[in-house]
Amino acid sequence: MEQDAEDIPVVYLHDIKRQYTQGEATLTILDGAKLALWAGQSVALVAPSGSGKSTLLHIAGLLEHPDEGEVYVGGAATSALTDAERTQIRRTDIGFVYQSHRLLPEFTALENVMMPQMIRGLKRSETVSRAKEILAYLGLADRITHRPAELSGGEQQRVAIARAVANAPRVLFADEPTGNLDPHTADHVFQALMQLVRATRVAMLIATHNMELAGRMDRRVSLENGVVVELE
């Protein structure tokens, strides 16, 4: 009997362990961590600096390998995949937003959003249409010809969000996406992210120190002694 796609997490981390060597010491960052991310659900990852938030995001997003455990994407295990296969999943199923927008300075907002689609091999006409649609949806229709230096901090982050969802990913990871923004601008960027979750049913995991924004998300989790714990 086939399992309904709605019953399968978009991403599931199972017994993830990750250690780093520092001199003669071994630091255990993740120690049996488990986490399920579901379609259309926003999850806040709230934990102190150095607790492993970025490591968890990188492993979940297939940017880093765990020492032990398994990452499932759409119900499929990824540990045995080649680097090329992992890269393909990142291009099609996963989007990333960082604290720094990481936009290419020589390209316009439109061109930055077109880039991941062109790398994927889509026709230019398709990439232009899709990029314009997303930028307009995020309130940037009149800024598409501007380069990053000509945009405000909030506009830069919204372009970064548009780029992250350009290939219609199934999951979006954001590492302190509002960390460099003032409270008013941070709220606008957060609303843009939540708007996309509701409209596209993408699963979203945000690492954040902003407890007010975290409180407006569907779930809140933290990291304690290398494991994921649910917060009230």
Swiss-Prot record:
EC number: 7.6.2.-
Name listed for the protein in its UniProt record: Lipoprotein-releasing system ATP-binding protein LolD
Function statement: Part of the ABC transporter complex LolCDE involved in the translocation of mature outer membrane-directed lipoproteins, from the inner membrane to the periplasmic chaperone, LolA. Responsible for the formation of the LolA-lipoprotein complex in an ATP-dependent manner.
Membrane topology of the entry: Peripheral membrane protein
One BP annotation, GO: protein localization to outer membrane
GO cellular component term, pick one: plasma membrane
Coiled coil: none
Residues binding ATP: 47-54
Subunit and partners: The complex is composed of two ATP-binding proteins (LolD) and two transmembrane proteins (LolC and LolE).
